[in-house]
From Swiss-Prot:
PROSITE patterns: KH_TYPE_1, S1. GO terms for biological process: mRNA catabolic process; RNA processing. This is Polyribonucleotide nucleotidyltransferase. Involved in mRNA degradation. Catalyzes the phosphorolysis of single-stranded polyribonucleotides processively in the 3'- to 5'-direction. SUPFAM superfamilies: Eukaryotic type KH-domain (KH-domain type I) (SSF54791), Nucleic acid-binding proteins (SSF50249), Ribonuclease PH domain 2-like (SSF55666), Ribosomal protein S5 domain 2-like (SSF54211). It is found in: Cytoplasm. It catalyses: RNA(n+1) + phosphate = RNA(n) + a ribonucleoside 5'-diphosphate. Mg(2+) binds at residues 487, 493. Gene3D superfamilies: GHMP Kinase, N-terminal domain, K Homology domain, type 1, Nucleic acid-binding proteins.
Length: 701
């Protein structure tokens, strides 16, 4: 087929969608070009048949940045791209979240989306281009999909308002970085970080993005009309209404009673018993439904039971009303040898969070398409299987853990001190020790507490809360502090983090259409109320950062020297600075402008290194008395070392008021003597005197 090209204006950018020239064996393939700078190839492949026995929709999204796109060659021994970076993993999740709910219920055919960045200008993030390309590739593929979607990034400035699809430079000066995706009539996904913006400003950004990306949706529809393949002839399995009614009649009341058990483990055990009874009664014999079909229908009964109870105003699973936060238990300083620690427990969700301070050398080195950069703040989230009472795989962080860690990082990052105020590298680790809903928001609260416990001068404490939604027809209920079951059975996962002043992070995933502005306003309002409640309880335990760092944390001393002294401190081949580090056990970082940061495991080590540097960089002061060591004796006098690397000459006539025949009559090499600096000439030569020391002392020098 001949290539089909569609070009449209998206804010200040010109976007081109092209299909039919590259990757023609994929089910759908689109080449997206933005401003002739960023080019992303997006392919979609769908299996024609479902894999029998899979009880989930096997959708996978892979976003990959090729180094050649930025004119670079990969590092490492093999000189080729390796495992996905954290940025690639996060972008893959960003694309997955808005498209997953748009595949029809019951569709189990495997679908794989691959987004490859093949060219970039290093000015803007290619993620929005990848999201647009995914929407277009799905729209033309013929795979059942209730799209297309649009996507946009929004920045915000107090003076200029909202800005569509900003550059990296514009984002750096912005108080908001938000990505929004959705259909023509609904927002499906929001991912953002902000600097204490109000709820109204955040909601305004969501609505602004939704209005702006309508241009994307229209262009994709036009491309699909011209180049789209016929929609697959797929029909969902016919629901077994008779079996559903039979199981509900037999077990509906028991399931309803099971969901009044407030302890998660006991509730799961009881519902598991009922599920096994249903399988035993309604399957197993010839002519009866399969066990998997019975389990699926039993799950549907659970789903409807919980949702009906909530929208009809009945108490939630654990007995709370819609606005109540679970009981909190907050501790700080729980680990004796760490730099800062906190144990944050909310109901059956618990996070042990630890903050560690390091030197500038501990910063993470990131090799990105834009170039190498150092990241002095890390927040890592771990979710071991024991946190939900299960056995499971132990190993490296998965996509979910990386995503939750990034959300927690976004939440607290805006409240960290500037590098010139607090030049430590900071690593926060959140160990989820119990989980029943919203462990990422527990990590936010725990991170804020641990950082303050470590003495990091936070601008303000931060707390987070997860909101949920159940909507049936015109009835809906917004839930504060959702449980794991409410997250699974609800229609929205809406996480808000911030300070008492404003929002620092907002993440939203919506599974249905019809989420109105009113519902989002209610959710933001309830989240604010809950956040202030949690902050109040956190402040009772630790209201502000400790004034001193932990005794276990490294001591940091900042100082500045003249730039022409840098080479003296470093020494030939780095010999001088290496010697200082080895002898004092401190680490030293020197910048080109003469700024020096000294990190010592103890205060004594840092002070010793500072004194060594001061000694090297100090200049001899005329009229000042020094205690020096005789380094060399010559016929006409003696050379005395008064500062590291600085020797002065005591002429034989300056040794004593009496006549001196031989220098060795008064001095010997290695002897310590007091000397007075008489003069320093324009070549840096120092003239010293021993005989004038007494008079100088008498005059008060």
């Amino acid at each position: 087929m001949n290539p089909v090209i569609k070009t449209f204006q998206f804010g200040q950018s010109t976007v081109t969608l092209e299909t039919g020239r590259i990757a023609r064996q994929a089910t759908g393939a689109v080449l997206v070009t933005v401003d002739n700078d960023v080019t992303v190839l997006v392919t979609v492949v769908g299996a024609k048949q479902a894999d029998p026995g899979k009880g989930f929709f096997p959708l996978s999204v892979h976003y990959q940045e090729k180094t050649y796109a930025a004119g670079k060659i990969p590092g490492g021994f093999f000189k080729r791209e390796g495992r996905p970076s954290e940025k690639e993993t996060l972008t893959s999740r960003l694309i997955d979240r808005p498209i997953r709910p748009l595949f029809p219920e019951g569709f189990m055919n495997e679908v794989q989306v691959v987004c490859t960045v093949v060219s970039t200008s290093k000015k803007t993030d290619p993620d929005i281009a990848a999201m647009i390309g995914t929407s277009a590739a799905l729209a033309i593929s013929g795979i059942p999909f209730e799209g297309p979607i649009g996507a946009a990034r929004v920045a915000f400035h107090e003076s200029t308002g909202y800005l569509l699809n900003p550059t990296y430079e514009q984002l750096a000066a912005s108080s908001l970085d938000m990505v929004v995706a959705g259909t023509s009539d609904a927002v499906l996904m929001v991912e953002s970080e902000a600097q204490e913006l109000t709820e109204d400003q955040m909601l305004g950004a969501v609505l602004f993005a939704h209005d702006e990306f309508q241009a994307v949706i229209q262009a994709v529809k036009e491309l699909a009309a011209e180049a789209g393949k016929p929609t697959w002839d797929w029909k969902p399995a016919v629901a077994n209404t008779e079996l559903f009614n039979a199981i509900r009649a037999e077990f509906g009341e028991a399931v309803s009673q099971g969901y009044t058990i407030t302890v998660k483990a006991d509730r799961y055990a009881r519902l598991g018993e009922l599920r096994d009874q249903a399988v035993a009664k309604f399957s197993g014999e010839e002519g009866q439904p399969s066990a998997s079909e019975v389990k699926e229908i039993f799950g549907e009964i659970e789903y409807r039971t919980v949702r009906e109870n909530i929208v009809n105003g009945k108490p939630r699973i654990d007995g709370r009303d819609n606005k109540t936060v679970r009981p909190l238990n907050i501790e700080v300083g729980v680990l004796p040898k760490t730099h800062g620690s906190a144990l944050f427990t909310r109901g059956e969700t618990q996070a042990l969070v630890v903050a560690t301070l390091g030197t500038a050398r501990d910063a993470q080195l990131l090799d990105t398409l834009e170039g190498e950069k150092k990241d002095p703040f890390m927040l890592h989230y771990n979710f071991p299987p024991f946190s939900v009472g299960e056995c499971g795989r132990m190993g490296g962080a998965g996509r979910r853990e990386i995503g939750h860690g990034r959300l927690a990082r976004r939440s607290v990052q805006a409240m960290l001190p500037a590098a010139d105020v607090f030049p430590y590298t900071i690593r926060v680790v959140s160990e989820i020790t119990e989980s029943n809903g919203s462990s990422s928001m527990a990590s936010v609260c725990g991170a804020s507490l641990a950082l303050m416990d470590a003495g990091v001068p936070m601008k303000a404490p931060v707390a987070g809360i997860a909101m949920g939604l159940v909507k049936e027809g015109d009835k809906f209920a917004v839930l504060t502090d959702i449980l794991g079951d409410e997250d699974h059975l609800g229609d929205m996962d809406f996480k808000v983090a911030g300070t008492a002043k404003g929002v620092t992070a907002l993440q939203m995933d919506i599974k249905i259409n019809g989420i109105t502005e009113e519902i989002m306003e209610i959710a933001l309002g309830q989240a604010l109320e809950a956040r202030l409640n949690i902050l109040g309880q956190m402040n009772q335990v630790i209201g502000q950062s400790r004034t001193e760092l932990s005794a276990n944390a490294p001591t940091m001393i900042a100082m500045k020297i003249d730039t022409d002294k840098i080479r003296d401190v470093i020494g030939k081949g780095g010999a001088t600075i290496r010697a200082i580090c080895e002898e004092t056990k401190a680490s030293i970082d020197i910048e080109d402008d003469g700024s020096i940061k000294i990190f010592g495991e103890t205060k004594e080590a840092a002070d010793a290194a500072k004194q060594r540097i001061l000694g090297i960089t100090a200049e001899a002061e005329i009229g000042k008395i020094y205690v020096g060591k005789v380094e060399r004796i010559v016929d006409f006098g003696a050379f005395v070392n008064i500062l590291p690397g600085k020797d002065g000459l005591v002429h034989i006539s300056m040794l004593s008021d009496a006549r001196v025949e031989k220098v060795t009559d008064i001095l010997k090499e290695g002897q310590e003597v007091e000397v007075l600096v008489l003069d320093v000439d324009n070549r840096g030569r120092i003239k010293l005197s021993i005989k004038d020391v007494a008079a100088a002392k008498a005059s008060g020098v």
